[in-house]
Amino acid sequence: MSLDIVILAAGQGTRMRSALPKVLHPVAGNSMLGHVIHSARQLQPQGIHVVIGHGAEQVRERLAAEDLNFVMQDKQLGTGHAVAQALPAITADTVLVLYGDVPLIEVETLQRLLAKVSEQQLGLLTVTLQDPTGYGRIVRDAAGNVTAIVEHKDASEAQKAIKEGNTGILAMPAARLADWMGRLSNNNAQGEYYLTDVIAMAVADGLVVATEQPHDPMEVQGANDRRQLSELERHYQLREGRRLMAQGVTLRDPARFDVRGEVTVGRDVLIDINVILEGKVVIEDDVQIGPNCVIKDSTLRKGVVIKANSHIEGAVMGEGSDAGPFARLRPGSVLEAKAHVGNFVELKNAHLGEGAKAGHLTYLGDAEIGARTNIGAGTITCNYDGANKFRTVMGEDVFIGSNNSLVAPVEIQAGATTAAGSTITQTVEAGQLGVARARQRNIEGWKRPEKIKKS
């Protein structure tokens, strides 16, 4: 079965009160539309057609890197009209209609829905709710067969009592779609062309409407305002938390933990409260992450420990290495096994060899640091001259005294030592002591200044 997917994303979202198109508002670091596209891709369709309208250029720009067919809906005349705009591009056997503001839909749910579709059968995703206000109602005959969908504004009081609502997500044989689209009418309370009217047409044409339901009603929850958006965010985070815990992660409090990207985890991982994982993050076995940390686009090897209030971005931390508290690893930072980065240490494009240590109050930028080298407190690599950046190279077993300024480009060779308070501008050769500071003078009879008395 070949598949085309149509995603409706033309709505304005006035209740969001935002210049940003509704479907671009984020859930877990990705736009709502981005989540829907991600799920759609996993179904391996031959085409994904995104119907856009309000904020069309913003949507195109945000998703320019995706392989999508954008279809313009100049006037928002209803869901049926929106799908009709995509008709010329549809060539597959089956069409699946999704919504750009329903980001939590599970791939497994869509697979079950698609399994219902045949030449003589549609698949319709419905949801049973205690309060289905706003949802179109699923009307069934005495035998339980779906006969129609009635929109809430057009429903009678008896129909409004029905608890089964229409999610809007449906799959159908493409060969029938063009005929049904041509027969749609806008004779309703909204004056719009409802996609849901194809259900009654299908029944009249002798097709069966087979229904499927999501395991969790939140899968089909949309977001029309900021409150609903926050509800989607929290539900997504709790769902991701459950997934990680099932894989061997201990979360101190799943309600105070956020995933905003793609996370791969090992076993016996411990994550404390208020931790944010962004982008592509790989966490191997036995890693411990303290509270209030952000980990972005990074790899944490087995046994890594990250202490409280640390920010790790674009970094690789080797087996048994540690960072923090209050450490910052910026893009290009690599810690080999058992390397240590302590409190108030910042790394940028720096490579620390096995067992190297930078314990506190240090900036290491554009630096190559050999195994077992020790960096004293207050050390700074002066890597930028206002126009270009330069590297600092330290060999193995180097000892850098406290309060050093290492003016790049500069090399401190294996086994060398620099004295505390030095400004190193030249090579310190292997085994040498580098001292670069003014000689101390003690002045006899010196008196401190006294405050001038006011008259």
Swiss-Prot record:
Stored InterPro entries: Bifunctional_GlmU (IPR005882), GlmU-like (IPR050065), GlmU_C_LbH (IPR038009), Hexapep (IPR001451), MobA-like_NTP_Trfase (IPR025877), Nucleotide-diphossugar_trans (IPR029044), Trimer_LpxA-like_sf (IPR011004)
GO cellular component, one term: membrane
Active-site residue list: H360 (proton acceptor)
Enzyme class, first EC level, given as a word: transferase
Binding site for acetyl-CoA: A377, N383, Y384, S402, A420, R437
SUPFAM superfamilies xrefs: Nucleotide-diphospho-sugar transferases (SSF53448), Trimeric LpxA-like enzymes (SSF51161)
Note describing how the cofactor binds: Binds 1 Mg(2+) ion per subunit.
Localisation per UniProt entry: Cytoplasm
EC code(s) of this entry: 2.7.7.23, 2.3.1.157
Highest taxon, organism lineage: Bacteria
GO terms (BP aspect): cell morphogenesis; cell wall organization; lipid A biosynthetic process; peptidoglycan biosynthetic process; regulation of cell shape; UDP-N-acetylglucosamine biosynthetic process
One Gene Ontology molecular-function label: magnesium ion binding
UniProtKB keywords: Acyltransferase, Cell shape, Cell wall biogenesis/degradation, Cytoplasm, Magnesium, Metal-binding, Multifunctional enzyme, Nucleotidyltransferase, Peptidoglycan synthesis, Repeat, Transferase
Location of the region described as Pyrophosphorylase in the Swiss-Prot/TrEMBL record: 1-226
Listed cofactors: Mg(2+)
Similarity comment: family membership: In the N-terminal section; belongs to the N-acetylglucosamine-1-phosphate uridyltransferase family. In the C-terminal section; belongs to the transferase hexapeptide repeat family.
Matches recorded under HAMAP family: GlmU
Protein name as it appears in the record: Bifunctional protein GlmU
Organism per entry: Pseudomonas entomophila (strain L48)
Protein encoded by which gene: glmU
